[in-house]
Amino acid sequence: MTNILYKYKGIFIYNNKMPNIDIQIKEFNKINYHVVEKNLLEDKNNKDYAFKVPISSKLTLEFSGKDNANVIVNTLRRVVYDNIPTYAFPVDLIKISDNNTIYNNDYMRLRLSQVPILNTDLDIYSLDPIYWINVDYSDPKRPKHSSEKQIEIAINVYNDTNFNKNITTNDIHYYEDGVELQKFNKECPLLIIQLRPAETFKCTMRAVLGVGERDNIWASAANAYYDDFTTDNMKEGFIDNPNNKINFTVESQGQYDEYILLIKACNYIVKKLDDIGNDLNKRFASKEIKESADLIIVLDGEDHTMGQLLNYFLQNHPDVMCSGLSKPDHLVNSVQIRISCADDIKSPIKPIFEQINLIKETYLHIEKILNKLNNKHKEKPNSRMKTKR
């Protein structure tokens, strides 16, 4: 396979070498969503004090290999938090029509915006900023993605008893494209509100597509973290990790299986690198960025997620003497990368595109392994994966 790196001075520059990526991934642990019964008493046969607890899904993968690095895993971690599109209920689309409880409407809108949307198929891995940056979700004329479904919840409850009454997800009506569905586990419902006698609560809420960068209610991962095994917490010192082993754990918010989530993250990263490469190609061709042994490249619209990834790979290129990243304003998504070449190299233009290509190949390699691991789970008879790509 031959890859076009960039077009410079009217000439296409090709990369004929296919990088041999030394990264291995194996499944360390996979927990699917399930329910367990617990008891406050030692006597488990006494069901008066028994209760059921939901256990969230969780996936732990072991990354290793000569080419593995913290920044590779950390980029996946940041992307699953901030960049994968999901559905959520923004407070603008939670309309409370009747509420005489002790909980005011602002509190309830904030609480209801945290209600998760579970097992909802979505065939996209990125969402154009026109659909979420500075968008007024209450505006019926707002731009909508063609894949966006109509997801609504209606709640209309009244406590006609003499006791406090818990209102849970068992008491709501959930609709997807006009069809009422049962999305929540009836054994372990989520608490919505508690009503005292003669209290009423009535509302409707509508979900929209967004990303975690706008608000964490759209984060596709509830938790994502890694252990790089380079520190000894007991001795408070550093230890060797010759095979660059990293255990990466992801807990889904519930819309996607963890494997699907990570595959989408790889697709997103490759797309972003394509966008960055195309933008740089235009700026080099138009002389906006002039050829020099010492370059400063500004990546508007990017933060440390893609900036630090590119900076790390540039630092590892043999023709780059040094590369550094800065974010001048932490409230503005724009990063600067300063690159200096080795003495015998006139410009870092070619190394930049070589490393963009190498990063793309790295995440395509990771995606390929994730697909294989995902397919193994699909083949298991007790697999509980419900989300498709």
Predicted regions and their residues:
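Protein-protein interaction/assembly regions in multi-subunit complexes
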Residues: T2-R389
